[in-house]
Structure formats: C-alpha cells, structure tokens
C-alpha cells in the first residue's frame, strides 16, 4: 500500500471510529480526549470536523497556536503524520516539552503533590514569582507546577483560582495517569511567535487555532489567554497580520475562529464550514455566569465556530489538492 493510500485509510478509519452514536446529540463526532491538559477553547469536540478536511497527501502539519493540542496530538498519534507545534506562551510549551520527552518523570513529580487547596495556593504563589521574574524555576519543576495549577483551576487558566471539583484524589490520580501514559507519536514542540513560524514553513500545511477575534458582532467579548485577568496573548492580537500572511502561504491551511461577520468577510475567498456541537463549560464545570442566568441558559453551550480551509498551492513539491 502506498504512503498516500495508507494515510487515506487511517483517516477514514479514524473518522468512522469517532462518529457519535447518541441520537439525542447534535454532535456529528464524539469528543476526542487526546490531551492530558484541560484547555479553554480546546478543540476536543472539533477534532473530527478538522480531520475531515486534511488533504490526504500531506506529510506533516505545522501548528503555530498549539494550546491544548487536541487536534495536533490526534494527527500525530492516530493519523501517523509528523506534527510540529508552537505557541508564544513559553511556560505552556516548557510543560509540553517535558510532557513529550519524559512523561514518567513528570508523573512522579506530580504524584508528590496532594490535590489540596493549601498546596494549590502554595504552587500558585511560586508560579507567580516565576512569572514576575522574582525566581527562576528549573524546567521540570516549572512543568510540574504549571500542570498542577492549570489543571486544578477553574476555566482553566494560568494563575487562576481553584476549582473544587478537581481537588479530589481519585480524579487527580486519573489525571496524572494520563500524564504518565502519554504517547503522542511523532510530535515536536517549541515556543515562537506565529509570524516567525509562517515565515519558517512557507510550503507546509498548517492548522491554526489563534485567539478568537474580539470585536463588533463577535460572541467573544473578553480575552482569556493565558488568563482572563491578564489576557496578554489575546488582547490586541494582530488578526489582520495573520490574515495577510495566510493569503501568501503556499502550503495550505485549516483555520479555526469564531463565526462572526468580520472573520467571514476577511476569509470570503476560502471554503468556510460552520460545524455545530454542544459542550459544557470546563468539561465538568456546571457553574454559569450572571449573563447566562439572566438569559435562562444552562451550562450546555452551542458552538459558534467557523472552520476555514485553503488547499495547498505548492505543486512544485507534488502536493495535490485532495481532501
């Protein structure tokens, strides 16, 4: 079987395996839990829709906005492609590097910390000192404390407040067992600005999940990366620069964003898809905010997503525009 046919078969088999069998669900595909970390805006329910669009003859995928990595890990683990992921949040990518290179050591370090509110507050204080440059943690300790703070927080969010439902030893043990057993396939990570990555890989296929657009007629009204109280990677994100650079990108791409008039207009020359799914906030959190209470909404939310697809343009390397 040729390499192209092999990837096509893996893709088809994977999509069949995640078809939702729940007749009451609007979700076409089941949630794919590939990442050890919870992530705001994570794509565990979008994996199937994105995999559908992957051209069958690409050899690797570049991700400039790695985040929680659900899509990227799925592509490397289940589809067998090389994936290189980047993110501007260095502390996050330090965690990912340790998670990939030494999951058992990370597990042992996490096992030493009990999931109590006292430990959460102590770890948060140390992480805050590192973030503010008062101390410098070694990579292993930084990865350990990041995971503990992040995965046990509400949201989740960096240096966020604790979530009681995760201060549970059984849940915590299952959580860190996923750290220990993590095996993502051919996945590499680094920390960089998306502009540098688009310049570095002009002919590679990309999956991009940037901070969602905040503006008129957008359902996203506040930045959340790395935390809603200091969204330095979200506020004033240069969406216009990303748009203009993607126009020149030859390798093809899939872009996720929020479905709003501005994004639809900016990318009107590309194929646009509007998948629908339902998700619960925090994948376990059932608290709802004042706005949703006033609107008599539940903690179950409908997606408002747009997925934009541009096939590879670079025929010089034998890339065919097949999906």
Task: List where the protein language model places each region.
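Short aromatic-enriched loop/helix-cap "lid" or pocket-rim segments at secondary-structure transitions
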Residues: 95-98, 159, 219-220, 267
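Class I S-adenosyl-L-methionine
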Residues: 1-84, 192-205, 215-221, 230-323
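SAM-dependent nucleic-acid methyltransferase catalytic core
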Residues: 3-47, 56, 103-224, 248
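Catalytic metal-binding/acid-base residues of hydrolase active sites
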Residues: 89, 211, 259
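Phosphate/nucleotide-binding beta-alpha loop and adjacent structural elements of enzyme active sites
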Residues: 101-149, 153, 259-264, 280-295, ...
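SAM cofactor-binding core of SAM-dependent methyltransferases
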Residues: 52, 57-127
């Amino acid at each position: 079987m040729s390499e192209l046919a092999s990837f096509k078969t893996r893709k088809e088999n994977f999509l069949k395996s995640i078809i939702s069998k729940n007749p009451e669900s609007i979700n076409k595909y089941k949630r794919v839990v590939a990442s050890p970390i919870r992530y705001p805006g994570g794509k565990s329910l979008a994996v199937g829709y994105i995999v559908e669009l992957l051209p069958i003859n690409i050899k690797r995928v570049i991700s400039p906005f790695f985040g929680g990595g659900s899509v990227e890990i799925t592509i490397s683990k289940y589809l067998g492609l090389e994936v290189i992921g980047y993110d501007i949040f260095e502390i996050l990518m330090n965690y990912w590097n340790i998670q990939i290179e030494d999951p058992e050591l990370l597990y042992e370090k996490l096992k030493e910390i009990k999931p109590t509110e006292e430990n959460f507050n102590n770890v948060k204080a140390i992480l805050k000192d590192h973030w503010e440059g008062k101390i410098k943690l070694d990579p292993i300790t930084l990865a350990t404390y990041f995971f503990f703070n992040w995965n046990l927080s509400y949201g989740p969010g960096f240096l966020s407040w604790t979530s009681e439902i995760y201060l549970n030893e059984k849940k915590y043990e299952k959580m860190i067992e996923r750290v220990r057993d993590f095996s993502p396939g051919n996945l590499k990570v680094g920390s960089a600005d998306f502009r540098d990555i688009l310049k570095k890989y002009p002919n590679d296929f990309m999956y991009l999940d940037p901070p969602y657009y905040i503006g008129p007629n957008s359902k996203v009204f506040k930045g959340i990366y790395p935390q809603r109280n200091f969204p330095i990677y979200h506020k004033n994100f240069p969406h216009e620069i990303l748009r203009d650079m993607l126009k020149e990108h030859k390798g093809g791409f899939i872009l996720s964003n929020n479905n709003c008039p501005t994004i639809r207009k900016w990318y009107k020359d590309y194929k646009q898809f509007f998948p629908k799914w339902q998700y619960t906030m925090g994948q376990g959190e059932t608290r709802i905010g004042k706005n949703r209470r006033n609107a008599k909404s539940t903690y179950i939310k409908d997606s408002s997503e747009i997925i934009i697809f541009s096939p590879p343009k670079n025929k010089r390397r034998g890339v065919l525009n097949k999906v």
